[in-house]
């Protein structure tokens, strides 16, 4: 399982998604939680629609010919179905690790087994700082981390 707003879909997101597919393997399934328009509206910068962001995800998955089955579910809050669903692992970045820890705490409270947390390193831009959607929207970097000014 992996989740986010994925707008714009940058190299950090791509690493997260690729790792999710690699962990699931050919016989597994990847669940991608994609923030709804309402939940994403809390961001300080403009966000494209759910459908536009979903199309970008599907195109990235197809382009990379991932063979693992996947499902994109609407994410209405930080946890989505992760506190209740049956799954084995969640893939997070350094930035979203606290959410995964909280998910496992909630699962324990509900009598569910904890899931494995796989943390990836955030992808760094040319300037050594994390690639982030906020930095891209501010015009500091592009989706590959190239400094724009």
Give residue ranges: language-model regions.
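Nucleotidyltransferase catalytic core that binds NTPs
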Residues: 1-149
